A protein has these predicted regions:
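Mid/C-terminal beta-alpha module of Rossmann-like enzyme folds, strongest
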Residues: 64, 136-173
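Conserved catalytic-site region of short-chain dehydrogenase/reductase
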Residues: 33, 72-78, 122-125
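SDR active-site strand-loop-helix element
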Residues: 25-28, 66-72, 117-119
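Conserved beta-loop-beta element that borders a ligand/cofactor-binding pocket
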Residues: 104-126
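Conserved Rossmann-fold NAD(P)-dependent oxidoreductase catalytic core, especially the SDR/UDP-sugar
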Residues: 38, 42-95, 103, 109
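NAD(P)H-binding glycine-rich loop region in Rossmannoid oxidoreductase-like domains
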Residues: 1-53, 57-60, 158
Length: 173
C-alpha cells in the first residue's frame, strides 16, 4: 500500500497519483454544509466530480481496479434501510446523497473493475473485525461501523474477485 496525494478537483493532478498502481481506493466525502472549509468550494459536488476526474485519470493510466466509498441509502441500499433511516438521510443530507447517486452512476458506467462500499454511519472507534458486508443488508439510524473497519473491508475487496461489480453495504456486527 502506498498513499499518494492528489487533488480530486484538479484532474491534472490525478494522473501522476494513479499511474503505476494496481488499484485505487476513493474515499471522497463532504459535509452537507454549503460553507465546508475543508471542501473549500461551497456547492461543488466533490464526490461525483472528483470521482469522474479519478476515473478519467485511471483510464488514461491503464489502472483497472477501483474501490469507492459511497453511503448507505444510496442506490438499492435505500430500500434495505429500516424506516425512517432512508427518509431521514435523504431529507437532511439531500445534496450529499444526490452527489453520491451521481458518483455511483459514474463508477458503474466507467468500464473499470469497480466495487462500491456503502458504510452506515461511521465512527472513530477502533477496528474490531466484527462487521457485516453484503448487497442487501438491513440497516437503520442506529447502525454504526468504525472507519477502521470500513477501511479494512475496502482493502479486503481488492483480493476478492466476487466483489467486482458489487455495491456492498457495511455495518458493525
Amino acid at each position: 500500500l502506498r498513499v499518494v496525494a492528489g487533488d480530486a478537483m484538479r484532474r491534472e493532478s490525478l494522473g501522476p497519483a494513479v499511474g503505476g498502481h494496481d488499484a485505487v481506493l476513493c474515499i471522497l466525502g463532504a459535509k452537507p454544509e454549503g460553507a465546508d472549509a475543508r471542501r473549500g468550494q461551497p456547492g461543488v459536488p466533490i464526490c461525483s466530480a472528483g470521482t469522474k476526474h479519478l476515473i478519467a485519470a485511471m483510464t488514461a493510466a491503464g489502472v483497472r481496479r477501483l474501490v469507492v466509498v459511497s453511503s448507505a441509502s444510496v442506490g438499492e441500499s435505500r430500500g434495505t434501510g429500516r424506516f425512517p433511516a432512508p427518509w431521514v438521510l435523504r431529507t437532511l443530507l439531500r445534496e450529499v446523497m444526490d452527489d453520491k447517486e451521481i458518483q455511483e452512476a459514474a463508477v458503474r458506467g466507467s468500464g473499470l473493475d469497480w466495487t462500491i462500499v456503502r458504510p452506515v454511519k461511521m465512527t472513530n472507534g477502533p477496528r474490531t473485525g466484527r462487521v457485516q458486508v453484503g448487497p442487501a443488508l438491513r440497516w437503520g439510524l442506529g447502525s454504526r461501523v468504525s472507519r477502521a473497519d470500513a477501511a479494512a473491508v475496502m482493502l479486503g475487496t481488492l483480493s476478492d474477485a466476487n466483489s467486482i461489480g458489487a455495491a456492498l453495504t457495511v455495518t458493525g456486527a
